[in-house]
């Protein structure tokens, strides 16, 4: 109830702001006469500081002033408090974060939707990343880089196939020997469910009609699949004989050549009846532009700079700019950290596109809560799915 009241107050504040009259106050200027913009950084390791420094050295019109802008018990702020401050124009013009603190519905009230900005760079971005982002229900945080959750296996273990159905995966796993499983045995039911949500949750929500289908047979099958993993409170298995190994592909690991040294590997998507994406998108750093910013044009200019070659060169993750990804790949091949075949495997992972869960935190918590009750034996998968459907349907209806 407290959260609902906060959101109602937030909407009222924004409506009041929309109806305000008069001229906007003059923007603060730096000592050199440039328009001053503020950027709050929520993580000490954020690359945003480097972006701001480089931008300031290039821009003749704007200057970014970076400040720590944290929330938590020590700071006396909650995420809701920060959202309210941003709506009132008391927060920074830009907000850089490395977490997923703002994957909620209220983001559309306080942050600028960045779909048009991405469209400007459509021909320059990694196609799979661009398409995954455009498939989301609004783009409010500009990713500075990305990673990919996927599964890896040995081509020799799957007959050289590029995709598997669940039945095929079970057959290949059985061929490994007694006690072998399809997925990592160390994954608990809850941990495995997180991967299920990451790869498929978005496909059970229709954002055009604000409806969902978590009571479908397909989702029920996924819940039952999770029950095949070890219980959350069970000890770690002594051995982990499995067909598919859950893998977060990061730029440092990939360009460092660690995975490639083994040689016999391939990327595999979540088993499905239809071939499709082999991985799902993860975004580390994101930069948001506040709706209440007094100089949205200047803030957008900075975001365009973040997508420039010189800024993308600073990104530790996989860069979202295709030319920078190509440059790093060429360098890795030339220095023999990977082969041309390795480069082709990365292309094969990205080219079919990437999944994007696009599930607001509130829905994620609903699904996780009901799933954990099922995994603990408090209800059947069908009962859990029915409760998920009811609660998420209500949530979506209230916001349609």
Range-by-range predicted roles:
Residues 151-156, 282-297, 314-317, 324-325:
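A bilobed periplasmic-binding-protein/Venus flytrap-type ligand-binding module shared by bacterial periplasmic
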């Amino acid at each position: 109830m407290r959260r609902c009241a906060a959101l109602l107050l937030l909407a009222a504040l924004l409506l009041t702001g929309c109806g305000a009259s008069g001229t906007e106050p003059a923007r603060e200027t730096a000592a050199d006469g440039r328009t001053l913009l503020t950027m709050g950084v929520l993580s000490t390791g954020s690359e945003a500081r480097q972006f701001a420094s480089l931008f300031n050295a290039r821009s003749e019109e704007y200057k970014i002033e970076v400040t720590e802008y944290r929330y938590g018990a020590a700071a006396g702020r909650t995420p809701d408090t920060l959202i309210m401050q941003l709506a009132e124009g008391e927060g920074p013009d830009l907000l850089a974060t490395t977490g997923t603190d703002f994957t909620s519905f209220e983001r559309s009230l306080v942050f600028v939707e960045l779909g048009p900005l991405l469209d400007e760079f459509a021909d320059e971005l990694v196609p799979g990343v661009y398409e995954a982002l455009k498939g989301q229900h609004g783009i409010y945080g500009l990713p500075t880089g990305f990673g990919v959750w996927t599964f890896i296996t040995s081509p020799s273990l799957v007959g050289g196939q590029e995709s598997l159905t669940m039945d095929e995966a079970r057959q290949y796993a059985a061929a490994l020997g007694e006690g072998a499983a399809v997925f990592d045995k160390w994954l608990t039911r809850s941990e495995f469910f997180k991967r299920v949500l990451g790869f498929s949750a978005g496909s059970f929500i229709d954002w055009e009609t604000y409806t969902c289908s978590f009571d479908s047979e397909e989702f029920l099958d996924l819940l039952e699949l999770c029950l095949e993993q070890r219980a959350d409170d069970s000890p770690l298995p002594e051995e982990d004989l499995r067909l598919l190994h859950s893998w977060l592909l990061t730029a440092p690991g990939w360009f460092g050549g660690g995975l490639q040294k083994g040689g016999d590997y391939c990327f595999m998507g979540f088993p499905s009846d239809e071939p499709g994406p082999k991985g799902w998108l993860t975004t580390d750093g994101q930069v948001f532009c506040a709706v209440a910013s007094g100089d949205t044009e200047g803030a957008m200019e900075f975001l365009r700079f973040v997508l420039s070659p010189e800024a993308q060169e600073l990104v530790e993750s996989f860069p979202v700019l295709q030319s920078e990804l190509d440059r790093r790949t060429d360098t890795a091949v030339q220095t023999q950290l990977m082969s041309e075949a390795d480069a082709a495997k990365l292309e094969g992972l990205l080219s079919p596109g990437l999944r994007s869960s696009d599930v607001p935190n509130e829905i994620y918590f609903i699904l996780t809560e009901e799933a954990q009750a099922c995994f603990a034996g408090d209800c059947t998968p069908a009962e859990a799915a029915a409760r998920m459907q009811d609660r998420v349907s209500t949530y979506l209806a209230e916001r349609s």
